[in-house]
């Protein structure tokens, strides 16, 4: 549907002749009409609208109401106008849609007139000429449905009654409003955020400014909101994080697989799972079939497991995929930089467990694995808060196990308890980062799933050769890669607030060493040092620009480069280098080999990728501004 909305002093029309063989039947009174102080709504119903007329009506009414509220009038003139489109719908459907729009608006209390359909008409109007006086809209069928179509699980999640507690490492379970949060201010912020359940973003978080200034990540106007572009430095960081988490999970014992990004709505197992998983989906049409873009790797991995022959000897069986991408059509007002996206990269491991005992053993191991993974990216337990969620029955039967989880993290944790189980899991934890706006985002998470082995037909053969349904664990040891980047940047924003220098973890620094010759005379020596560093798998570059030395140092500081080397006559003659360390803001004279040894020791065990930009600073494009 195409709509042209004109705020007018008046609109009047007069029927002249038939435009269709069978136009709408009208009375004598309908051959002329006029409204003053009116929003004139010229409308073309298109062929594509026939796929979903109800949603077209709903969406059109919503758009008209929004404009009416802005121009502050109660008078609306619905005017059929075929000239807005070359792909017109059938007259019968078009008239039905226009009548329904008219009736919907009348039912909402507006003063509505509709010009007759299927006639040539003369009309006059007087556009008011203010900034909102002339607007146009294009409405696509199904668009409103995608926004409003909410899985049953999401509705239930909003209705679910939760009981909130704080659990101490000593095993004391305290109602959240009776807990003394002294010394646990971050936990208090997290508890408030979880209990209030408001995800609306009204202020830009600090990490957004950092990601833009550092030329890491940017918004992409050519895509749907919540889909981002990555510049070379940002892509390097993201790629290293992807490799790091993948290496950790494979080292833990998972088998890596790859699965499709879209799945059939009508697949019986998938259809049932959709109604148990609280997420909004992107919808794709292929011919007459509807598909949804995956929001996790569960679907593909479960379908692989369904077709596999699994013995009790294989258990626990771990399968892993790094999804690039997973998709969730989050509400527009909840999208926020790297924290909440519609397309994201999710490390996703699923484990087949023999029984609850084995599942709980794996759960605890994966809890510890998640702590280890976050430690590697510079996040310690002081940087995140723990939420553990379960039913009252699970708590009564497994108190010691839950208390042990609080003991492992070594601080009080937030408990969400339900009287009965609604979700497919019986136990879940998340490590949550609380940012500078007191918003929380889940990073690592593990769940014990008691439903999906039966739903998908996943079985294993026990010691007697009997086919049994296992339990399943869902684990992301880091959470979405984008959220890890968000947490790293938000942590550095907190450090900056305290007047300290921000830093990337050394292994993630896009440029680890910047070499600055004091003049062009020493450029070759600077390149020689850079070559030695690069040969040792250290990312180094040379600032060869014709700028003042202090300016070059300042700009290297702005890029958070951990080591800055200045070379001149003394360094060349003595064979040493003068290094400024960002970590302690001190200057040292050392041998190149000693610097290589230091950096290699600090980055040992982490993945490496070459420098993402040209070796000479003068050869780099500017990606922003």
UniProtKB/Swiss-Prot annotation:
Pfam families: HGTP_anticodon, tRNA-synt_2b, tRNA-Thr_ED. Its cofactor is Zn(2+). The N-terminal domain is an archaea-specific tRNA-editing domain that hydrolyzes incorrectly charged L-seryl-tRNA(Thr). Catalysis of tRNA editing is performed by the charged tRNA itself. Its EC number is 6.1.1.3. Catalyzes the attachment of threonine to tRNA(Thr) in a two-step reaction: L-threonine is first activated by ATP to form Thr-AMP and then transferred to the acceptor end of tRNA(Thr). Also edits incorrectly charged L-seryl-tRNA(Thr). The keyword Transport does not apply. NCBIfam families: PRK03991.1, thrS. It comes from the Archaea. This is Threonine--tRNA ligase. Disulfide bonds: none annotated. InterPro entries: aa-tRNA-synt_IIb, aa-tRNA-synth_II, aa-tRNA-synth_II/BPL/LPL, Anticodon-bd, Anticodon-bd_dom_sf, DTD-like_sf, Thr-tRNA-ligase_IIa, Threonyl-tRNA_syn_edit_dom_arc. Transmembrane segments: none annotated. GO terms for biological process: threonyl-tRNA aminoacylation. Binds 1 zinc ion per subunit. Gene3D superfamilies: Anticodon-binding domain, Bira Bifunctional Protein, Domain 2, D-tyrosyl-tRNA(Tyr) deacylase. Zn(2+) binds at residues 298, 350, 474. Residues 1-147 are annotated as: Editing domain. Signal peptide: none annotated. It comes from Thermococcus sibiricus (strain DSM 12597 / MM 739). Belongs to the class-II aminoacyl-tRNA synthetase family. GO terms for molecular function: ATP binding; threonine-tRNA ligase activity; tRNA binding; zinc ion binding. Homodimer. Coiled coil: none annotated. It is found in: Cytoplasm. Keywords: Aminoacyl-tRNA synthetase, ATP-binding, Cytoplasm, Ligase, Metal-binding, Nucleotide-binding, Protein biosynthesis, RNA-binding, tRNA-binding, Zinc. Residues 206-505 are annotated as: Catalytic.
